[in-house]
Amino acid sequence: MRHEELLTKTFQGPAVVCGTPTSHVYMFKNGSGDSGDSSEEESHRVVLRPRGKERHKSGVHQPPQAGAGDVVLLQRELAQEDSLNKLALQYGCKVADIKKVNNFIREQDLYALKSVKIPVRNHGILMETHKELKPLLSPSSETTVTVELPEADRAGAGTGAQAGQLMGFFKGIDQDIERAVQSEIFLHESYCMDTSHQPLLPAPPKTPMDGADCGIQWWNAVFIMLLIGIVLPVFYLVYFKIQASGETPNSLNTTVIPNGSMAMGTVPGQAPRLAVAVPAVTSADSQFSQTTQAGS
């Protein structure tokens, strides 16, 4: 039965629509149901918060409403050692909440600010104990004080500040030059002291042969080339010419014949020999023997 009753109900539009600069509120009337209906059928209030481009268009950040957890934003000056994790642990909030409130994309965006917004509970212990947390200044409560100096005083102050900056700059340059000169003098003195204590090394001996030419002069090289290229070949040709012209075609050879004639004989490779005829002489013994034989 309960399910059938819910199906028979028709959609009921909002009776009242309230518009605000940052949100829209829709008011619904109670239906003619039983007293035991759920809280969904009761009147409720819907608050839509701007997101994305609408938040940037509004220009002014509105703190959360009291019904959304009673959270307020307090401002804290950043120190050099602060980080998102440290702030979250110190004030009992989430890192995501701090990044969301301050529009951080990365954790490094924290170091670009001088102060950060911390979401804390309204009327909580943190608001009473932590004195470094300060409430945010609204644009209406901020007061700007502008002090205008006369033109002469302003010009004098500007020139005095510029002169002081220039003097400090030039003094720094002079100090750097003095330090460089002193360090150079110290290095020069230490080098001179080191070289004075070291013994002088003997000069290396010069080698007589230098390079591929063995240390000879250019005219010596020219003379050697002429001797090898011209004189030796000419001497070689002349020597073989003389040897070829000195040999005779035939050699004479002479032998002695016993009957007193002379004969010439040629033997290849030997000098010619001459043979002279010698008359035969018989001794007295041979004649005596011949006469005795005839008398007998």
Curated annotation (Swiss-Prot):
Biased composition (Basic residues): 46-59
Region feature Disordered, mapped onto this chain: 29-67
Cytoplasmic side: 239-296
Domain of life of the source: Eukaryota
CDD domains hit by this protein: LysM
One Gene Ontology cellular component: membrane
Principal location: membrane
Transmembrane segments: 218-238
Localization annotation: Membrane
Residues with glycosylation annotation: N30
InterPro entries given in the database record: LYSM1-4 (IPR045030), LysM_dom (IPR018392), LysM_dom_sf (IPR036779)
Keyword check for Phosphoprotein: no
UniProt topology in membrane: Single-pass membrane protein
Extracellular-facing ranges: 1-217
LysM domain segment(s): 74-118
Keyword Phosphoprotein appears in the UniProt entry: no
Annotated protein name in UniProt: LysM and putative peptidoglycan-binding domain-containing protein 4
Originating species: Homo sapiens
Organismal lineage: Eukaryota, Metazoa, Chordata, Craniata, Vertebrata
